[in-house]
Amino acid sequence: MASNFNDIVKQGYVKIRSRKLGIFRRCWLVFKKASSKGPRRLEKFPDEKAAYFRNFHKVTELHNIKNITRLPRETKKHAVAIIFHDETSKTFACESELEAEEWCKHLCMECLGTRLNDISLGEPDLLAAGVQREQNERFNVYLMPTPNLDIYGECTMQITHENIYLWDIHNAKVKLVMWPLSSLRRYGRDSTWFTFESGRMCDTGEGLFTFQTREGEMIYQKVHSATLAIAEQHERLMLEMEQKARLQTSLTEPMTLSKSISLPRSAYWHHITRQNSVGEIYSLQGHGFGSSKMSRAQTFPSYAPEQSEEAQQPLSRSSSYGFSYSSSLIQ
């Protein structure tokens, strides 16, 4: 994990063709890798001083790139072309052949995941596509300092159907920490943050973890979908156990229940699928199931400025940031 992470891959003076005048103009170009501050992109400034003070600049996000190539010398000397899948392109010329090669190499490595000196004339690497897909499914986040962990900084977040993982930004194979989705108490987001509260069953123990990211909404939706699936699986198992208990009770046989899945450690996530309602939670009593009712936890509503103070009182300290939470009770 990098607390002093630098997202600048390469920068320098180049010449970019003006769309209005059709002539090449000199500017300062900065290539930044994907991070918690934003996606992979090119930032164009009038000069180096403007880049230092972060003055007005134009940004080109590097998504859906089809190819990155060098242009023939007769077309434009020391030129690099970025070709997108929609057949549009962006071309710039460097001040030397060495600079052009450097720009092309870094762009290919970051945007296409390849190295110029890699020669793959034999059979295709069947694992490469899967590895690349897994890398693309990770989100760039910045873990804010917290007393529960001795690490913080830039990293990548992966969300599976059961867990949340943090991976090292420099070595994608190094796992930093893991939280089971079933042990989260609540989670929320806004446009630049994602946060969740872990329960005591997690390796980190109880605590609030906050991440700075431009992909807070996407992370939230993926976590929420996974927790819904866990809740539905839990509900299906409870129904199967109830039916089996009733059948064995009617046959006056001893009841033996096998646990087919690992149930969420947090107590009853039914509120995720049915918010602001009361539902039945079955508990095993003797050889059968007796049903008792208990109020489900409330899913925190989205922040609204016009809310009264009384409506905001149930929210926790972290909700003052404007996050919309989904919550569950921890046993």
UniProtKB/Swiss-Prot annotation:
Residues 132-237 form the IRS-type PTB domain. Keywords: Phosphoprotein. Residues 8-112 form the PH domain. Transmembrane segments: none annotated. On Ret activation, phosphorylated on one or more C-terminal tyrosine residues by an Src family kinase. SUPFAM superfamilies: PH domain-like (SSF50729). GO terms for cellular component: cytoplasm; cytosol. Residues 293-331 are annotated as: Disordered. PTB domain mediates receptor interaction. Interacts via its PTB domain with phosphorylated RET. Belongs to the DOK family. Type B subfamily. This is Docking protein 6.
